[in-house]
Amino acid sequence: MRVATWNVNSVKKRLPRLLVWLDERRPDVVCLQETKLADAAFEQLLGAELAARGYACALHGDGQWNGVAILSRVGLDDVVVGLPGAPGFPEPEARAVSASCDGVRVHSVYVPNGREPGSEHYRYKLAWLAALRENLRADTREALVCGDMNIAPTDDDVFDPAAYVGQTHVTPAERAALAELQDQGLHDVVREHWPAQRVFTYWDYRAGMFHRDLGMRIDLVLASGSLAERVRAAWVDRQARKGQGPSDHAPVICDLDEAPDGDIGPVVPPPSAPLLKRGVATTPQGAPRS
């Protein structure tokens, strides 16, 4: 089973790229974030195209902001929209949806950005992560937690740690919250598969960050123990970040039981630009802002 997660940064803006990508990569399950469409609008825009490709959809959107979805062609059962017990800002936001796909509990999550350390948004982010952790703790089913975590797990997951000092996505409290989430028996499949390689999933649109490979790894697939053992390939589809009108995130792909493209990765295709030496080019254009 091929599972992918992708922050598309607006489904409407990503058409027809999304459909072309589905046809090329043929994932069985897709977790989308930042769909930025109400459910009815999503169905009107994509329902027929997805049905023709064999996908059923679990949607949780609220229009202009946020929005998550699960697309599955291997079953879509026991759908839960939202995150029980999660705080709102001030109302609950469309940041989580889960479903069972071919016997696997799949969660598509879009963790709040946090904006500025110590701010109200930052406290909301930490509280939301705590609610996610408690939901996973209470559910003993084997699970894949997929999505935009808006946290780089370690300094190895940013192009230059010194450039992000004082910003969100890298603070000790955020990383501790992510570690506590993983303490529920979840494995970061890309990092476990590629422990020493330079791997990013997000590059700011500005200042040629993508072409210079100045990014962050904030989009993760976290797998519970027995599922992690089934992983045959785990990689970032950098090709989807190229060309005209891309999302600022690349999809992350995880193959269970068999790998149709072989054990490729960690980034496909690899960056062509020379690697940046840490501490040389600082002043990033910043972590994601929404």
Tell what function each PLM region has.
Residues 1-56, 63-68, 263-277, 281-290:
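N-terminal, active-site-proximal structural segment of metallo-dependent hydrolase catalytic domains
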Residues 3-7, 22-42, 106, 132, ...:
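Active-site beta-strand/loop signature of hydrolases that rely on acidic residues for catalysis
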Residues 13, 37-40, 117, 152-153, ...:
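Active-site environment of divalent metal-dependent phosphoester hydrolases
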Residues 36-38, 42-116:
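Structured beta-strand-rich core segments of catalytic domains in phosphoester-bond hydrolases
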Residues 46, 51-53, 128-218, 271, ...:
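Metal-dependent phosphoesterases centered on the DNase I-like endonuclease/exonuclease/phosphatase
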Residues 64-79, 209-230, 256-257:
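Conserved beta strand-loop-helix elements of the APE1-like EEP
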Residues 84-87, 111-129, 162-167:
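Surface-exposed cleft-lining segments at the edges of enzyme active sites
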Residues 209-211, 240-246:
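Short proline/glycine-enriched turn/loop segments at secondary-structure junctions
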